[in-house]
């Protein structure tokens, strides 16, 4: 069984944050703390190999953890951040969480690790109703597939998952875990829920 200490983790903070008015989402405050700090708190209780993928504010993010940008230009989405994480991290298994989901559970790493089988390429969180495509654990052997996928202009993570041996980790006991804060309205709306 894959152990959490055999994995490394990347917080995805490389987006353009258009719905947040272009403000770097990782530094948006939620409950008096930057979203990047919520993400770090989630992971530091579970693992010690943590990095950040960002395409701006790299110096600021570097104060929190090792930070690296996408290797593909023009913001091709979270898949580019995943590619960069797989290339830059040392472990065979690399996990990813978004910077804008401050309610992820403290056992996220072990739940994803427990779903890994011998031939698994990717584990994706599933909340009982929906797949959560950017809360995932990937094996480095898929780097060539992601590279080819992005090079040909594909961006939809779900299509990549169909090309790989993808399994799901059950997070149905955590119905509010995957709330995403993409806009000022969502920050306000979910501030009392979490």
Curated annotation (Swiss-Prot):
A single BP term in Gene Ontology: bis(molybdopterin guanine dinucleotide)molybdenum biosynthetic process
Residues at which GTP binds: 12-14, 25, 53, 70, 100
GO cellular component: cytoplasm
SUPFAM superfamilies the UniProt entry points to: Nucleotide-diphospho-sugar transferases
A Pfam family the protein falls into: NTP_transf_3
Keywords per UniProt: Cytoplasm, GTP-binding, Magnesium, Metal-binding, Molybdenum cofactor biosynthesis, Nucleotide-binding, Transferase
Family: Belongs to the MobA family.
NCBIfam families cross-referenced by the UniProt entry: molyb_mobA
Domain notes for this protein: The N-terminal domain determines nucleotide recognition and specific binding, while the C-terminal domain determines the specific binding to the target protein.
Designated name of the protein: Molybdenum cofactor guanylyltransferase
